[in-house]
Amino acid sequence: MNETLYCSFCKKPESRDPKKRRIIFASNLNKDVCVCEYCIDVMHGELHKYDNSLLALKRDRLRRMESSAYEEEFLLSYIPAPKELKAVLDNYVIGQEQAKKVFSVAVYNHYKRLSFKEKLKKQDNQDSNVELEHLEEVELSKSNILLIGPTGSGKTLMAQTLAKHLDIPIAISDATSLTEAGYVGEDVENILTRLLQASDWNVQKAQKGIVFIDEIDKISRLSENRSITRDVSGEGVQQALLKIVEGSLVNIPPKGGRKHPEGNFIQIDTSDILFICAGAFDGLAEIIKKRTTQNVLGFTQEKMSKKEQEAILHLVQTHDLVTYGLIPELIGRLPVLSTLDSISLEAMVDILQKPKNALIKQYQQLFKMDEVDLIFEEEAIKEIAQLALERKTGARGLRAIIEDFCLDIMFDLPKLKGSEVRITKDCVLKQAEPLIIAKTHSKILP
C-alpha cells in the first residue's frame, strides 16, 4: 500500500479526488522533499514578479546611460595625510621613495583643494556649520602630475593603489590609441567615458576621479619645429588633451565612440579631475646631457651607462620636455614632475616577496587552495628577478615568467593534495621539473 505524500511547503496531503484534486511531485534527488501543483503555481507567480522588478532595474540603469547618467553628491569623508598615503604605497610599491613622496603630496593637495571648494560653496549658501574665517577666498590651481620612468617601474601601480585606498574612480588609458577628431582611432573624450563607467555613471563621482594616461611620450612631436604635414596622433592629440586637462566642460557620448550631432551627450566638468600622465621618454637623457654638458661639439661624448642615465633624468626641466616633443601648454598643465628609477635586481627580489599582493604570496595562496604547499628557493627567486631584468619588462614581466615554468605543475595540481612543491633555480630555467614531496612519506614523488 502506497504512503500518502505531503507537500513540503503547504503540508497538505495528495488527493486524487476530482473535486479536491491535489497532485504532489516528489524530488528525484530526495524523496522526502515534495511539492504540490498549487505551491508550484504560487512560486511561479513570485518568480515572475521578481523577474519584472529586475527588468525594471535594468531598464532604469540603461535609461541613465542613454540619457544624462545621474548625479549624486560625492565627497571624501576623510583625506589622509601625505605620510599615511605614502605608507599605503609602501605596502605595494618597492623603492621609488622620492616619487612616492611627490605623488602622495600631490594627491593630498588635490583632494584638500576639492574639500576647500566644497566648504566655500556651502559658505556661499549661508551654511552656518561651515567656518572659514581663518582662510582667504583664494582660487587654488589644480596640480596634475607627470611621471617619467621605464616600463614596469610602478607608475600605474601608484595611481591604482591610492585610487583604491581613497575609493575614488580611476580610468587608465593608453595615449598611443588616441587620434585627432575625424581620424580612425579613439577620441580624447573617450578617456572621460571610461571614467564615467568606473564611477557607475555617477557624474559627480566621475568629476572627482583620477585619469591616468600612459605612454604620453609616444604622442610627442619629432622636433620643436611644427610639421607641415598632418599630425594625426602627435601634436593634434596634445592640443585635444590640453582642453580636458586644464579644466573645461566636455560633452561626451554615453556609449563612447564618435560624437554624433543628433546624439545625446553627458556633460562633465574636468576642473576637479586629477590627471596623471606617464611615459618612459626614451632618449630624454641624451637631451638633458646635451643641455648640461660643456662640450659644445659633442664628438667626444661617451655613451652613458644605465646609472648615469637615471641620475641625469632627475635633472629634467621644462625645456627638455619641449625639445623632446611635448607642447609647452600641456607641460604647463602638468606642474608636478617626478622621475622613477629602473628597478634593480635587489628591488625586483623584494617585489616578488614583500608587497601585500606579492606574486609569490599569490601563487602560494593558489596552491594552498588545493592543500599544496609551494616553496620557492632563494636562488630560484633571484633567477626569476634576473630574467625579468634581462627581458627589460620591469616588474610587469614577473608573472609571465612564473606562469611559464608553473604551467605543467598547475595543470596537475588537484591530484597533488597534501604535497609540497619546491621551485628550484633549474626549474625556473626549465632545466628540471619542480620537486614534489609527499608530506606523509617525505620522499620525492616520481
UniProtKB/Swiss-Prot annotation:
Annotated ATP binding sites: P150, T151, G152, S153, G154, K155, T156, L157
GO CC aspect terms: HslUV protease complex
Protein name stated in the entry: ATP-dependent Clp protease ATP-binding subunit ClpX
Complex formation: Component of the ClpX-ClpP complex. Forms a hexameric ring that, in the presence of ATP, binds to fourteen ClpP subunits assembled into a disk-like structure with a central cavity, resembling the structure of eukaryotic proteasomes.
Assigned keywords, A-Z: ATP-binding, Chaperone, Metal-binding, Nucleotide-binding, Zinc
Source superkingdom: Bacteria
CDD domains, per database record: RecA-like_ClpX
Organism the protein comes from: Helicobacter pylori (strain ATCC 700392 / 26695)
GO term, biological process aspect, one: proteolysis involved in protein catabolic process
Domain ClpX-type ZB: 1-55
